[in-house]
Amino acid sequence: MKILLATDGSESAHSAVDCLMRFPFPSDSEVTMLTVIDRAVFKNEELTDLNDEQQDALEETEKIVQEAAQELLEREAARLRNAGWSESSELRIGHPAEEIVAVAEQLDIDCVIVGSHGMGGIKRFLLGSVSDYVLQYAPCSVLIAKEPGLLPNESGETPTSPADDKHARPLRMLLAYDDSVPARQAVEFCTSLPLDQQAEVTALTVLPLITLYRQDIRQRLSWLWLEKKKQALAALERVTKEIGRATPHVEAQLREAADVSDEILHAASEYRSNLIVLGHKGKGAIQKFLLGSVTTRIAHHASCSVLAVRNH
């Protein structure tokens, strides 16, 4: 599997590296580390009328920033090498979000990993800018890495580092499933991962209710609704059998709610999930609306990492 890991030196990006090392990617995966220097910092329209001294200072600053970015790449790459990963690195200058998507296209990447917020000292919130753009336009799956906090292990002790945490708790995956083509692709992605015997997977389907004027009461009693529930349960049964080949700890949940994304978030909190997986809807106008109403909302509000799967 080809993985692109975008880093900017922020704590969030550092957590993305931790997430990569804890995530059950195939051991022969190839990782490309990418750092993008925002061209706008040095190509600002207000910086056009500079004297020679100011221009020299700007060029020196740009050189220092590039050297710092290269050092950052080398540090993070060393972490990956020490953990046994095969890696390479890329340093680009341009618009961060656009460069991430461009590199993903050029290198035929299978999964892009970005932090949930950061941008170094600027502390710019990524969701709503860079990661939103990557989530929308990347030609592949996108993993938005978050640090959900360290959970107590079996003995009730709290790990002191992410590395210890890896051994203290299993992967707890919540797979949001609606039997669509993207959802089935998400299942295929999950079953392709080398999940260990401790991994826990909950396949969740949420049927949307129309609560206006208590229409949900009539909706629940209609034969069409009962047929939808029957079909949803059958689809969940197929999914649990597929994932059951990868790990024995699989269960299915069928829920009904007026707000699908809220119910998914509630379930993730209830199950103490450390990863939510959804099928990616794509880039079209209608699909963009769906993406904004479910996937992006979950990416914004989930307390754990979110993987939006899209085959390319």
Where are these regions (language model features)?
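Gly/Ser-rich helix-loop-strand patches that form or flank binding pockets
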Residues: 2, 26, 102-155, 159-160, ...
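Aromatic/hydrophobic pocket-lining residues that form π-stacking "cages" and hydrophobic walls in ligand
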Residues: 20, 76, 100, 134, ...
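A short acidic, glycine-rich active-site loop
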Residues: 54-68, 221-234
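Aromatic/pi-system hotspot detector in well-structured domains
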Residues: 15, 19, 25-28, 33, ...
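Conserved beta-strand termini and adjacent loop/short-helix elements that scaffold enzyme active sites
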Residues: 34-36, 90-94, 145, 204-206, ...
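Small/aliphatic-rich secondary-structure junction motif
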Residues: 1-56, 166-221, 242-248, 253, ...
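Structural beta-alpha unit
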Residues: 63, 67, 71, 75-112, ...
